[in-house]
UniProtKB/Swiss-Prot annotation:
It catalyses: Exonucleolytic cleavage in either 5'- to 3'- or 3'- to 5'-direction to yield nucleoside 5'-phosphates. The keyword Translocase does not apply. One of its GO terms (cellular component) is cytoplasm. GO terms for molecular function: exodeoxyribonuclease VII activity; nucleic acid binding. Heterooligomer composed of large and small subunits. Bidirectionally degrades single-stranded DNA into large acid-insoluble oligonucleotides, which are then degraded further into small acid-soluble oligonucleotides. PANTHER family: EXODEOXYRIBONUCLEASE 7 LARGE SUBUNIT. Keywords: Cytoplasm, Exonuclease, Hydrolase, Nuclease. It comes from the Bacteria. InterPro entries: Exonuc_VII_L (IPR003753), Exonuc_VII_lsu_C (IPR020579), OB-fold_nuc-bd_dom (IPR025824). This is Exodeoxyribonuclease 7 large subunit.
Length: 450
């Protein structure tokens, strides 16, 4: 009976494991520390130690959890880890089973950004050989950005000023927040499903790294790279950069610069047309002058080598052949006159003046037609723009405020349900003409399910 009080190693280890499993404080543990002894075998699991200056904790992260982290862990990296404490019975030790990991500190996003940039650059997503040439004269431009930001106003204003005939199709999307990257990818896909879009602008106004982060997401960068429609990326201000800038066909410093790259200025085209017209007239005038000089040379040649001079020499030589020479001279004069008339007729026939006048008339008609078409299209686009502005004003949340509704915020976040509030919470209510601040003193939820 004395032997019954002794436990096996497996039994005591199992007992300790059960203690960890039932301890509520061990089921979800948040740990901050430095990674060391990092190993990743072919299985895809991560084995490492989390340490600080006083202790260390053996840890493991299984493959499914590893696939969900957005960066590559490295030795010496400070991290924040969520997981549970358990017992590895075969080794007889407790260890940390990590379920989520993210870099710790201000530079966390920069680390993730640089690692993703290096990965995509190795895959060739930023190669110059892949970039497409922007069309010289697009007729339709798609814009993927927020419908309420300054970026869309700058793009629309610039395009309509430079080339009023170009149709601009705006694909409104959220440009920051949890689902912003997904919405941007969806809109890029919709644009590529069409066959009439010549060039696409994606972007937003300036902001912090976190606010611009959607354009650093891997799905967005790959969607820009895979787009069959040429893409101009215009994210933030001139000093801001996003990974979509590198995978796009062209990077613009600002949304306004993107619009200038997308369409030419019709005034520049008019100047180029006028310049070509001037060059055509200059070449024609030079050709006419050369023909006139050639004609003068022919006249001088005819005077110096004409039959009259030959006849005078024959008369001085002998009177005997006077009559015969007169007859011969008359025949030769008639022949030369006929030839001269033929040459003169041919010269008039091939004279370029009539062709020049015809070309000038056609050029004037085409210019007049082009001006009428541009004015007509400008008027049509202005009418469409006015209707769109009226529709946007009708859908504006400010219209709801004018009808007596209010919008409630808690700590700067929109309150969508009474479940978002607790008794004692401070709230702000935006109403027509201003806002009020209040505190929740009572709460009653709607049990009807509405």
């Amino acid at each position: 009976m004395e032997q019954d009080k002794y436990l096996t190693v497996a039994a005591i280890t199992k007992y300790i494991e059960k203690k960890f499993d039932v301890d509520p404080y061990m089921k979800q543990v948040f740990v901050r520390g430095e990674i060391s002894n990092l190993k990743q075998p072919a299985s895809g699991h991560l084995y490492f130690t989390v340490k600080d200056e006083f202790a260390m904790l053996r840890s493991v992260m299984f493959q499914k959890a590893v696939q969900k982290i957005g960066f590559v862990p490295e030795d010496g990296m400070n991290v924040l880890i969520t997981g549970r404490i358990g017992v590895f019975t075969k080794a007889g030790r407790y260890q940390f089973y990590a379920e989520h990991m993210e870099p710790d500190g201000v530079g966390a996003l920069y680390i993730q950004l640089e690692q993703l940039k290096t990965q995509l650059e190795k895959e060739g997503l930023f190669a110059e050989t892949h970039k497409k040439v922007l069309p010289s004269f697009p007729s339709k431009v798609a814009v993927v950005t927020s419908k309420t930001g300054a970026a869309v106003r700058d793009i629309l204003t610039t395009i309509h000023r430079r080339m009023p005939s170009v149709e601009v199709i705006v694909y409104p999307t959220i440009v920051q927040g949890e689902k912003s990257a997904q919405k941007i990818v969806e809109n890029i896909g919709r644009i590529n499903q069409r066959n009439d879009i010549d060039v696409m602008i994606i972007g937003r106004g300036g902001g912090s790294l976190e606010e611009l982060w959607a354009f650093n997401e891997e799905p967005v960068v790959r969607a820009v790279y895979d787009s069959d429609v040429p893409v101009i990326s215009a994210v933030g201000h001139e000093t801001d950069f996003a990974l979509s800038d590198f995978s796009a066909d062209v990077r613009a410093a600002t949304p306004t610069a993107a619009a200038e790259l997308a369409v030419p200025d019709y005034r520049d085209l008019e100047e180029r047309l006028a310049e070509r017209k001037y060059r055509l007239l200059t070449v024609t005038r030079q050709l006419l002058e050369r023909k006139e000089r050639t004609l003068e040379q022919l006249k001088q040649h005819l005077i110096l080598n004409g039959p009259k001079h030959q006849l005078e020499q024959q008369i001085e030589r002998t009177d005997y052949f006077s009559e015969r020479l007169k007859n011969a001279f008359s025949k030769q004069v008639l022949l030369k006159q006929t030839m001269f008339n033929r040459l003169n007729d041919r010269l008039h026939y091939y004279h370029p003046r009539k062709e020049i006048e015809l070309q000038n008339e056609q050029l004037a008609v085409r210019k007049q037609a082009l001006e009428k078409a541009m004015k007509r299209q400008l008027k049509d686009k202005q009418q469409v723009f006015v209707r769109q502005i009226e529709a946007l004003e009708h859908l504006s949340p400010l219209a709801l405020l004018k009808r007596g509704f209010g919008v409630t915020y808690k700590e700067g976040q929109l309150v969508k349900s009474v479940q978002d509030l607790e008794v004692g919470d401070d709230i702000q209510v935006k109403m027509q003409g201003g806002h009020i601040e209040a505190s929740i003193t009572a709460k009653e939820e709607d049990t009807s399910g509405n």
